[in-house]
UniProtKB/Swiss-Prot annotation:
Protein name: Inactive atromentin synthetase invA4
Residue span of region Adenylation (A) domain: 37-460
GO biological process terms held by the UniProt record: biosynthetic process
Entry superkingdom: Eukaryota
Family according to the record: Belongs to the ATP-dependent AMP-binding enzyme family.
Source species: Paxillus involutus
Annotated GO MF terms: acid-thiol ligase activity; phosphopantetheine binding; transferase activity
Positions of post-translational O-(pantetheine 4'-phosphoryl)serine modification: 629
Pfam family of the protein (one): PP-binding
Amino acid sequence: MNPVAVTSVAPVDIIHDLRHSEHATEASPITLLHVFSRAVSQYPNHELNFITSSAHDSIHTKTFTEFDQYVRALAQAMLAWGKPAGSVIVVYLTEHEDNMAAIWASLFAGYVPCLQPALSAQQAHKEGHVAHIKNLFSSATWLTNESGAEQVQSIPGLDIHLLSELQASAETVSVDFQTHQPHLDDEAILFLTSGSTGFSKAVVHTHRTILAGCNAKGQSYGLTSESKIMNWVGFDHVVGSLGMHITPLLCGASQLHVHASAILSDSLRFLHLIEEKSIQLVFAPNFLLAKLTRDLEKRSDLFGKFDLSSIKRINSGGEAVVSSTAQAFARTLKNLAKDGDASFVFSTGFGMTETGAGCIYDTIDVLGTSPPHEFLEIGTPVAGCEMRIVNPEDGVTPRPDGESGELQVRGPMVFVRYYNNPETTSSSFVEGGWYRTGDVGIFEKGKMRLSGRIKDTVVVHGVSYGIPELETYLQTVEGVAHSFLVAAPYRAPGQETEGFVVFYSPTFDLDSEDAPAKLYATHRALRDVSVKLITLPPQQIIPLTLNQMEKSTLGKLSRARLLNLFKQGELAKYIIRAEELLGIARGANFVAPSTETEKTLAGIYAGIFHLSVSDISTSENFFEFGGTSIDAIRLKREAESAFDLSEIPTIQIFKHPEIITLAKYVDSLVSKDASEEEYDPIVPLQLTGKKTPIFMVHPGIGEVLIFVNLAKYFQNERPFYALRARGFEAGQPCFTSLDEMVSCYAAAIKRTQPHGPYAIAGYSYGGVIAFEVAKRLEVMGSEVQFTGIIDMIPHHMPRSDWTGGLLILSYFLGLVSKQDTNDLAPSMRPLARTEQFEMVWKLSPPERLVELQLTLEKLEHWVNVADSVREFAKKYEACSSVSVLDVFYAIPVRGTKEDWFNNHIKRWASYSRAEPSYVDVPGHHYTLMDFDHVPRFQKIFRARLEARGL
């Protein structure tokens, strides 16, 4: 067959001007600002609607005219910053309206907005990224909110402006000012790449590229001034800002922008909004289609209840769309629709940040036709775009129709360059202006479909993760030969999202007597590292001989070669051998589920850990297997549902981490034979290892879930026990004094570990409890060799009333923002406590309530337990001393880290008989042990234990 290159003819309006520079002169009236002004002039009463992250059930509306006045006032206020025209403004905001306003205000003021995605919670990565951005733009002007400013406040040299302050200034200015008049090829908006293969690149889009792409998309979508679209994608992504805002703005269409949390937490809201607002166009990537289908397909009580007649098109992209997923979703919509004959048109597409969102589309009625492939085709280019398939080795030789190769595109919507990065820009294009997408595609029978990626990333639910970074961490696993490991992106047949395969050479002989046990441990570790880094285990782990893992002359392993061998079945004998050895290892300690309860629990385990039920032994420890605090809540929730139980106390999940013991406990609940257990503060989070155990005291909220992720790092090293406050279970009274609590905890520790030396630590207010317990043990004649204080001070505990305690707990649980804890207190205090609970409840993200399995009653009970502990804190003053202290400190809730350390943390010196060790740890007070920070915290914490001879 002949080589293929496909071109779509451009429409003869805006695109004609944009593609031919001789017509697009400096006097040309076509820029983004003209488009905005035209929309306001022609459709003054059309609407921009917003649903925010904190108010899922209410819609905030501005007409085009009102929004125009708002952003022009912001632009006038921006000019007071005194920045020269063309300055880059890093926009770091979370709400759609705020991002939208920041973009247009920047453009009117003559600045270039750069949309910053959510920053990493890992301090080192965040600081490195911000420093990179500062150097890239040779400036450091940020427009953000209070939360964003808090995240970057520790990074020097930034010129940070708060949106709230800009809004206040805008209220006092006149909007009658001369707005900036850009040229067609001026930089308009910058977008940051994911940084999946290193630091982010800044993609430069000009007025020309944006208008070319948006005009072509608008025609492809069939938008008119009467259209209504719904978007939930953030504005830091080109789909949200260009595809679902500027594109409909070109034709004056009204828009509804919904914060992602509102859709992801409540699938029904997706349908209600389509019905309520008569939405015609929505965007739903493959992972959302799958989620909506899972949530809604069994809701037979809702069949025929929704008027979905307005919806004309469902766009999908970001990752390949599984044909069966699209069909299942369409069937679900049809069942839910009032019109039983309704059909739903899917438009699968391909686009990148560099192409300004979608540039290749296909429309298909997935129920009216049978898709010929596992993944839906992505079709043909939009007007003005060209695409071709070439040999990926040389990047220029066209591939015949039906053969796979590298997808390349060109056209007026393709970005002009990477900001201040000419080398990468040059390498991204080949002769003729073709952009190398890094994707593998096949053009056949007039349609394009994707079949993989060339670049070193794996896409999980639309999010790109860097393969090199993943390999770096996997390489550290014991049992992996140094520099003989690669991970390759791979999408197995039937999978809804992309995954990966790990190839490696083991350090041990697979024919040795202990090979089964070593292989099992190595594969378990590789899986655990993968889940922690990219939330997904490998689809296959394949141990190979060194000869099979051949390297190039430059010492590189070929992912493509190994993946091809795997796909062709050439590695089958290695996979079979590994399974035989793993089977031997599992068989040595494997106990298959026997009772119906055990089988049901094994099924829940398998679902959580992405395994087959046949791989689950009843002797497996849930937390040693990789279970997190969120997994524990999921286990609790699914078990309650499976066994029709109103409550399985969280503490029992910790006390019965093996299926065999949890099944017996569940059976006792079902038969109502469960006896009331005597309170024991000790919660064993992991019991392996021979080194001195660590006892970790709960923070002020009394619960120990925060320690689950940390405990896993002590497997096979030392037992890890947490101490949980009294009062959580029915009939348990709260402690009445700190002395009573300390006496109880000291006795429990002695009962668990009769003889010293002891290692005790506490987080937040748990730090002072740990200090008091250590003192008590020393009075009892025991040696306490390690007393850890994690981000707490020894004097004048912060005093807060009941309302403050409720808000602090709610913030700790992720129900409200830090700003809410300050802003809400004055208005809440006069209210009755029930009304205060209801106010917090309305602000709480529904998905977080589901995640925590929280009800109003449970929250009230939790507040009462925390309030009893808070009463101790109000009266506390440290006295006396212990033999030695290790004090860990992070970014404080208020003030600077420097002040926190010098004027508060260092006062612990008065209460240690030896010079304390002060350790700076990454993160904020409330995040230092979260998923992102715990890998670094555990290294620091374990190093201090070892330094103390433990």
